[in-house]
UniProtKB/Swiss-Prot annotation:
Family from the record: Belongs to the bacterial ribosomal protein bL28 family.
Pfam families: Ribosomal_L28
UniProt-recorded name of the protein: Large ribosomal subunit protein bL28A
GO cellular component: ribonucleoprotein complex; ribosome
Length: 94
């Protein structure tokens, strides 16, 4: 499974770890991806979304209406906006 948040689009970060002697080794910073279930009262069902900790905060803060407005305005990630008719998008924009 890919390490990508379905809400924010956050993905793996790359860089280098620098030791005390300034040796640099490549490393990666994976996002904090959680599998979260949300209940959709309009469809009377639960769906599962792979979302980062920041994405959970976004859903808690904005709710489904705020996330829907962001997707329409173009501030949502491209993969999120393409799924306009899918149930995944419906779930992600609680």
């Amino acid at each position: 499974m890919s390490a990508r948040c379905q809400i924010t689009g956050r993905t793996v970060g790359f860089g280098k770890a620098v030791s005390h002697s300034h040796r640099r080794t490549r490393r990666r910073w994976p996002p904090n991806i959680q599998l979260k279930a949300y209940y959709l009262p309009s469809e009377d069902r639960r769906i599962k979304v792979r979302v980062s900790a920041q994405g959970i905060k976004v859903i808690d803060r904005d709710g489904h209406r705020g996330r829907r407005r962001a997707a329409r305005a173009g501030s949502a990630p491209a993969h999120f906006a393409r799924q306009a008719g899918s149930s995944l998008r419906t779930a992600a924009i609680l």
